[in-house]
Amino acid sequence: MKEVYLDNSATTMAYRSVGELVQKVMCEDYGNPSSMHNKGVEAEKYIKEAKETFARLWKVQEKEVYFTSGGTESDNMALIGAARANKRAGNHLITSSIEHPAIINTMRFLEEEEGFRVT
């Protein structure tokens, strides 16, 4: 029987070429991209190339591209940033009860700690 995987919004199989590159980076080019030694310089090249690629695809500037550790951190950054940036326009935020916990918890934070009204 052929497997049909329907949870791709949570985890999707990587292309083989992506998996091979990730393995190479993690096993060979694993330097700290913030360091000035050779491994760090090589690691920084991967980040720079990725930023250039994403910026070109999304038609934005490289300085507008941020990499995070995952979806929850991205949700937090986007929601908190947008809420704070637009607070002068009003402090009412609207969400739904079926949102991912990362969204619900961030909305709760904005309500309890930053004074937003959430419905």
Residue spans for each PLM region:
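Pyridoxal 5′-phosphate
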Residues: 1-119
